[in-house]
Regions:
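Short, hydrophobic/aromatic-rich segments at coil-to-beta transitions
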Residues: 39-43, 59-66, 85-90, 192-199
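Mitochondrial intermembrane space
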Residues: 70-73, 77, 129-237
Length: 237
């Protein structure tokens, strides 16, 4: 039975098979996808806009989980984006659920109990469809291979071990954070064959930003890259 559940879950996420639309509620389909992802898929964890965003991936993301923070920086909940065959399938928020068809059209807007949300106009549906689709595309790009990862995957990099991991992490940081150069002090950065951890400086458009980061690597892929700005304003270029 367990194998059957996993197979159905992955089918929903990857487009290998699908349940009839009336066979399971949207929440149940989300749950099946989550069980399958937890059992069989690789994960990625990257920082973006001040939060650490997790994805379960099979090449492309199947589920992306985004923390929701309040104005005081405290965790209030989580939004989850679900993808089926590489297309946005649904979104789950603390107080709402949304379903999309294969053409990218928002077809359901449900409340936290799984019932049709009240007082939702056609214009509201259209606006929410545009916003969620745009947000999903933005999040999906975070988990695309960086130029450094692409080059390493094709065998175009002669570095090995800790040097390769350091190079991959620097490339990923520049791709995600929008910088063009990374510097570091040897005493403040630990480098290993499976990643780096410590302090670096990233050159961005507004100047140099000191960061405390942790980066993990598996083969030519960066599987985790999380960071926090260190105290102090950007240093001039």
């Amino acid at each position: 039975m367990r194998n059957t559940v996993i197979a159905l879950s992955l089918g929903l996420g990857l487009g290998l098979c699908s349940l009839p639309s009336m066979a399971a509620s949207l929440a149940e389909q989300f749950s099946l996808m989550e069980k399958g992802a937890e059992s069989a898929l690789d994960t990625r964890l990257f920082s973006h806009d001040g939060v650490d965003i997790k994805a379960w991936v099979d090449g492309a993301p199947v589920i992306i989980a985004v923390p929701i923070m309040n104005e005081q920086g405290k965790l209030e909940g989580e939004s989850r984006y679900y993808f089926k065959g590489g297309k946005l399938f649904g979104v789950k928020e603390p107080a709402a659920q949304f379903a999309f068809d294969d053409g990218g059209k928002l077809t359901q807007w449900l409340d936290e109990k799984g019932q049709p949300a009240e007082f939702v106009s056609k214009m509201s549906m259209q606006q929410r469809e545009v916003w969620l689709t745009k947000r999903a595309a933005e999040l999906g790009k975070l988990f695309a291979q960086s130029p450094a990862e692409q080059k390493a995957a094709k065998g175009g990099v002669k570095l090995k071990g800790a040097e390769l991991a350091h190079w991959l992490c620097n490339g990923k940081l520049m791709a995600l954070a929008g910088g063009d150069k990374v510097t570091f002090e040897q005493a403040k950065l630990k480098t290993r064959a499976d990643g780096i951890e410590g302090e670096v400086s990233l050159r961005q458009e507004k100047g140099w930003q000191d960061l405390s980061l942790k980066c993990e690597v598996q083969g030519p892929q960066v599987t985790r890259l999380t960071w926090q700005p260190l105290p102090g304003a950007n240093k001039p270029l």
